[in-house]
Amino acid sequence: DVTAGTLGGKVFQGSGCHGTNYYSRSNNHVLANSNAGQFGDLILQPGKVDGGLYPGDVIGQLHDFQPVMISTTANNIMDAAIAYTTPSDVGFATPAEGYGAPVAATVSPVMNLKVRKYGRTTRMTTGRITSINATVMVDYPAGTAQFVQQFVVSGDYSQPFSGAGDSGSLVVVNGGADDRKAVGLLFAGSGNLTAVNPIGPILARFNVQIAGD
């Protein structure tokens, strides 16, 4: 029943560049319908609101998700899920107007780090990390959930870094020696502020690596 979101690239399990299992990564609330999804649920790309139809636009099946604890005292650290996909159906690079492919490495969020993302709604945007180790409250259909150890991005030029439908976008470093290294997974926003899950715990939770350059 989820209508719109962003696939935040491709990840794999296995060793080297030839992973044994490939998955698309996004948010729980995008791929798993805010805890209501069932393993094996079909994933469409594009989503229903963008004209996606069964069976022609099916690209995979829900494989796993981290449940979001609906509580204002919870210690959620991610809103994340993965869907099993056939490698030929989903690439790991952004569209031509994006930043290309992420680097198959990660960095931890630090203050004032320049970042960018490519998402379904606002496409390519840039910003800076303006808060780390943040605690944020996010509304879900079942109630409000608290997230801890998050980071916050402010869009450049007083413009929003994200909009509705950008959830699931991979946030990467913008420029410098760490250009295109993954920093986090976008999951919520309000006005010019966007909340992001650090990428490290997500990769560890699902035992996956980023597919990229």
Give, region by region, the residue ranges found by the protein language model.
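Serine endopeptidase catalytic core focused on the charge-relay Asp
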Residues: D1-G155, S162-A164, V172-D178, V183, ...
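Short hairpin/turn module used for nucleic-acid contact or packing/dimerization
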Residues: G163-D213
